[in-house]
Amino acid sequence: MSKRVVTVPLQGGKVAVNPQFQDALKQIGLDPNAVVQRVQEELKKVGKYPVQKVEVEVVSPSKYEVKIYLPPIGDLLLKLFGKDTGAHDARNEVIGNLSFAQLVEIALLKKDELKSKTLKSAVKQLLSTCKAMGVTVDGRKAEEVLRDVDGGKYDEIINKFEKQWQQ
């Protein structure tokens, strides 16, 4: 059996079970209830972050993977803060604030898209986006936090999650 992809219908951040979705899963040999339960478990992992789409990649009836796609980082931040655009003057305007822990969490969730070799470089990439959009981190300008990351101030926090990044 070649790999098949079934898009999971979502409504309000939850699986919207409909007959077409159930039939598509049954045709592949999957139990729709088990798939829905697994998708819901995966959605819990992304918690409060908006989900762009969810797919079930099926290799065989006994082997499938749930893939959750978040919006691009800029859009993700805008949705988190309920904004339509980033700051018009990012040096002087703030559209929202993230904790450093949230920044690390987003980096881990977006790992496949960031293409960074280390969590530290992924965090730095996110900080650059925050800087351009007018997002502060722990109430401080992103460029200040970036300097602290380069200086090793956040190494303890980053190292705590590095194993998770390497998986």
Swiss-Prot record:
Keywords (A to Z) from UniProt: Ribonucleoprotein, Ribosomal protein, RNA-binding, rRNA-binding
Pfam short name (any one): Ribosomal_L11
Entry-linked SMART domains: RL11
GO molecular function: large ribosomal subunit rRNA binding; structural constituent of ribosome
Coiled-coil ranges (or none): none
Single GO biological process annotation from the record: translation
Disulfide bonds: none
GO cellular component: large ribosomal subunit
Role this protein plays: Forms part of the ribosomal stalk which helps the ribosome interact with GTP-bound translation factors.
Family label: Belongs to the universal ribosomal protein uL11 family.
HAMAP family according to UniProt: Ribosomal_uL11
Assembly and oligomerization: Part of the ribosomal stalk of the 50S ribosomal subunit. Interacts with L10 and the large rRNA to form the base of the stalk. L10 forms an elongated spine to which L12 dimers bind in a sequential fashion forming a multimeric L10(L12)X complex.
Protein name: Large ribosomal subunit protein uL11
Name of the gene encoding the protein in the UniProt record: rpl11
